[in-house]
Amino acid sequence: MENNLQVNIFCIQKSDEFKTCSEKYSKLISKYATLKEINVFNKKIALAQNLNAIEAKKSYEEAFMPYKKGYCIALDEKGKDLTSIEFAKLIQDKNELSFFIGGAYGLREEFNQSLDFRLSLSKLTLAHQFVKTLLLEQIYRAFCINNNHPYHK
């Protein structure tokens, strides 16, 4: 299968406790798309997070701005709830997908509104490290749905 689709996941995290699980889904996704996972955590973000939520969110946005390309999706607890089938339809027929996972303070409302879509994986507040793993699984599931693979039953 030819991988014409580019999937980018941009996140802000110090460590990846779920690395083994994330790698499993990254490998499975590679059958359907080229996947890039980019952690943009830097010293400026670390300092801003120690100041306050406003400065932290500004630093996240500055780190993410150069990567706004393709169909851009913010992961946001206030975003739209989708079923796996609805998510599969959302990402179908796109050439490039860019997902943005905020840090400990989430993302600024203005940044979220500047993107193409806001997706909620849950109404619960989730650790951003876990969100990436959950997102990878749902991307893989969506590809399986769109390609009639039996993974999604």
From Swiss-Prot:
Its EC number is 2.1.1.177. It catalyses: pseudouridine(1915) in 23S rRNA + S-adenosyl-L-methionine = N(3)-methylpseudouridine(1915) in 23S rRNA + S-adenosyl-L-homocysteine + H(+). Gene3D superfamilies: 3.40.1280.10. Keywords: Cytoplasm, Methyltransferase, rRNA processing, S-adenosyl-L-methionine, Transferase. S-adenosyl-L-methionine binds at L75, G102, L121, S122, K123, L124, T125, L126. It is found in: Cytoplasm. One of its GO terms (cellular component) is cytoplasm. Specifically methylates the pseudouridine at position 1915 (m3Psi1915) in 23S rRNA. Homodimer. This is Ribosomal RNA large subunit methyltransferase H. It comes from Campylobacter jejuni subsp. jejuni serotype O:2 (strain ATCC 700819 / NCTC 11168).
